[in-house]
């Protein structure tokens, strides 16, 4: 029995770790290599999954992107390896391989999960993981889970995550075995005879610390460490985005979002008197009279010329979900996706250089109806305390004229706090998903179909029409063109089958266009049609294969169509002025006529000085500070990192959308001043609660 016992004891002792600095460093490096391979594999998966965006970009560009990405991956790997580096101070800690394997497996599994999730996130938003993730998590969990379950291959991703986590655990276990020295222990305790003394381990730690600091900084230059802009080394926005690390991007967004001092709010960069005067020069026109100038930035009395008004009584704003300009036939889009909107454009006035102020429905709603821009730190204005401020939108201006109102929507008004926000602004009648009886189709995620919404809209408009009735304004908002693109069966339009990953999106857009066409076909038979101004506008666009500049203008460019009696006779059929959603309210008020006091952050696009090409200030969703100002054929992009120089692009929309960088553009300084002045002054007005028709605080 002595020999078997001795053999058993020998095997047990051989399984115990005799920690050495050399073996521990080898283990750390091998584990780091496993994580680096995982991040490169995730980057490759992101590239392959979104391969439609490659277009004619050469392979060398993506090789450069992957090389750039290694530096960001290495930064995260260094962070995850900190416990292993600290273990150099203790022989017992170095021996705790089981704990290290557990930590690395859990941390890498989380990063793997985020990487898998990011493949569809990027396809949808053309951005790496950012503050939008937290915004969706913050919303109604039932709706979010329903959207994910019905809109994305959740089971497939969960299986891939489980298999990937298992493989990672095997890889870390293999790294442990490959670097585990074997030696006898006395009494089962850790021997320290082969472990370097503490001062030697301290010296090794200092060397490792220096190496890790350099690796985490990502650069040997003096000054700031590697920034996200350092990956923007190619002409392809897709390739540049690939160079980022989604986990790091999400962590940065979390830090910004959870910052107690709200670091993501725009900070003043200019003297306020200068910024305010610049904004006034941008917005106050010849028919405006500035009022309350010592308190309010751009509050003014506007009297539109009588010859530019229209014989209208009512106003109907139709906010179309994800109605992207790049797929509208009248704007040069292929595939016959919007035949009804294309035909409607022949009887109205179509703006072909129009943009949403943001890339989320939330921003489209308050920009279009409340006439307030999308600002850094206030992308979800309607859910913030500042969202309770009285602004200067259509509800305030038309309620003051004793207009009746109605807001018809497929979904739940609680989702973006629409009912709270718009009722506070002056609206009184809300028709949401729970108010529809026997709808043609109801989606468990979002609500009823667009055709149901439009049919109910017809009922509500007719109920408000009549000789003895008040004039009315209405907001009709569609929703079917949103993930998971649940549509009625049988579908009244032909499915799109030749656009790859965009097939479902474009099919839903074609359906929304059909529903819009049915609405107008029925509405034009009603008496109110001949005395109503209809505004059809997209809440935002969506990305496709072509990313126009790093701002991805396809996500912002939307149609804006005005239909009203006599509009073509006075203003023509096509308008090339640059505008955004915050220009809609003053443009409406200009057609109604009569003096109005407002503080809109846009202008009447049909009463601009001769030769004025218009402008627009835009910002993508998320918590970052990247913003841009658009002119007739140029766009200046101001990166979120204030230390980085802005970029000027010359862009083109229509049948051949593209953008190219303009080196040393002469208007860079001018447009940057205008953009920063606009953001700074609008932010100050909102925080000071002086952005409305009247002050929200005592003088």
Tell me what each language-model feature is.
Residues 12-16, 178-199, 463-471, 568-572, ...:
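Intrinsically disordered, low-complexity coil segments
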Residues 69, 73, 147, 170, ...:
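Residues that form generic nucleotide/phosphate-binding pockets
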Residues 61, 507, 558, 624-625:
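Short loop/turn microsegments at loop-to-beta-strand junctions
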Residues 7, 16, 225, 568-699:
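Membrane-interface soluble catalytic domains
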Residues 191-208, 212-215, 472-480, 489-491, ...:
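Extended, compositionally biased low-complexity polar/Lys-Gly-rich tracts
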Residues 119, 151, 322, 540, ...:
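Conformational gate/switch positions in structured elements
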Residues 218-599, 608-614, 619:
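Soluble catalytic regions of membrane-associated enzymes that act on cell-envelope
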Residues 2-264:
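Transmembrane and membrane-interface helices of multi-pass
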